[in-house]
């Protein structure tokens, strides 16, 4: 018996790619906090192998689920403790701080402007008042009584008194500047000195000459100003002498280096016990008229002055 090998017949079928099916389902509730369930379902089908002898087919299905919690803020309706930021602009804090700083700067600027205006107004008022006083001084008599004048009669009297005081001060200052007694540094007759020797007697005699000339020119000053009378001045000199005698001893007859008031010759010679002020100018200067016999009768200082100037020969 002959055995034959049996070879089964196989038919090849074209295989397709596997198909993947995914299904996702989600649900969310806004009114109540709920959980959403996500389910995924995938189904895969394997390729089928068919043959003439037998055919097989298989399929697989898988599913998964994930729970996710959702947070929902509470509603602002009817709740005063929750700030509703939707109704206010962004940067509210910065706007409030900037408004406060701006208000401070604006108040400082307003204060500066007001103070400057008030000071300028006060200055203008004072300057206008001073100009008006100087401009209308002495013209109140000619002004009409119907006009409103800001200056009264008392003001006019005070202006006249000020003018009189200024004129008297000017006259006294001119008189005092004209003669500075017993000051060889400031006296005009010492400007052209040819020697360095200072003669007290010569200065006294020259001062008496200039003082007598000046008295003849300005005698009206003594009439207008009672403070320049000789009697008043002598009383003042006596009081000063009493005060000085208590502090220091009596000084010798020497020229004073400080300026004195007018008519101080009598008080000066009285204080120094000198009789030169009682001698007339002609007799005080008579010794210089005869240079031949002057060295026997004139003072030693004048003789030495003549020798130094070349008017006397030893």
Swiss-Prot record:
Membrane topology category: Single-pass membrane protein
Residues recorded with modification Phosphoserine = 148, 254, 274
User: Which cellular component terms (GO) are annotated to the entry?
Assistant: cellular bud neck; fungal-type vacuole; vacuolar membrane
Q: Identify the stretch(es) annotated as Disordered.
A: 32-60, 240-309
Q: Cite the entry's keywords alphabetically.
A: Membrane, Phosphoprotein, Transmembrane, Transmembrane helix, Vacuole
In which broad location class does this protein mainly occur, judging by the first location in its UniProt entry?
membrane
Q: Which domain of life is it from?
A: Eukaryota
| Record-annotated membrane-spanning stretches | 93-113
Protein location: Vacuole membrane
Q: Residue spans with biased composition (Basic and acidic residues)?
A: 254-269
Q: List the disulfide bonds.
A: none
Keyword Phosphoprotein in record: yes
Q: Which family does it belong to?
A: Belongs to the PRM5 family.
For this entry, the protein name equals: Vacuolar membrane protein FOSTERSB_4073
Q: Which organism is it from?
A: Saccharomyces cerevisiae (strain FostersB) (Baker's yeast)
The organism's lineage is: Eukaryota, Fungi, Dikarya, Ascomycota, Saccharomycotina
């Amino acid at each position: 018996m002959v055995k034959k090998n049996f070879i089964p017949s196989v038919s090849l079928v074209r295989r397709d790619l596997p198909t993947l099916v995914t299904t996702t389902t989600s649900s969310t509730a806004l009114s109540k906090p709920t959980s959403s369930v996500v389910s995924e379902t995938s189904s895969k089908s394997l390729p089928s192998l068919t043959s003439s002898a037998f055919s097989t087919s298989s399929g697989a299905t898988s599913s998964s689920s994930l729970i996710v919690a959702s947070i929902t803020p509470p509603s602002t309706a009817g709740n005063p403790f929750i700030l509703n930021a939707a109704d206010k602009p962004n940067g509210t804090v910065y706007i409030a701080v900037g408004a406060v700083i701006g208000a401070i700067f604006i108040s400082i600027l307003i204060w500066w402007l007001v103070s400057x205006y008030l000071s300028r107004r006060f200055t203008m008022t004072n300057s206008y008042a001073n100009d008006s006083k100087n401009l209308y001084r002495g013209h109140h008599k000619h002004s009409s009584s119907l006009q409103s004048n800001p200056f009264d009669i008392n003001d006019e009297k005070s202006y006249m008194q000020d003018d009189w005081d200024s004129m008297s001060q000017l006259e006294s200052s001119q008189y005092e500047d004209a003669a500075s007694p017993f000051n060889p540094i400031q006296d005009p007759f010492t400007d052209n000195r040819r020697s360095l020797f200072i003669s007290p007697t010569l200065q006294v005699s020259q001062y008496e000459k200039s003082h007598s000339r000046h008295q003849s020119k300005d005698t009206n000053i003594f009439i207008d100003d009672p403070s320049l009378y000789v009697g008043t001045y002598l009383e003042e000199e006596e009081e000063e002498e009493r005060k000085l005698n208590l502090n220091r001893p009596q000084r010798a007859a020497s020229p004073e280096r400080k300026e004195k008031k007018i008519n101080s010759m009598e008080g000066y010679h009285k204080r120094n016990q000198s009789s030169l002020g009682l001698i007339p100018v002609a007799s005080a200067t008579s010794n210089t008229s005869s240079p031949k016999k002057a060295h026997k009768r004139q003072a030693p200082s004048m003789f030495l002055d003549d020798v130094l100037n070349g008017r006397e020969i030893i």
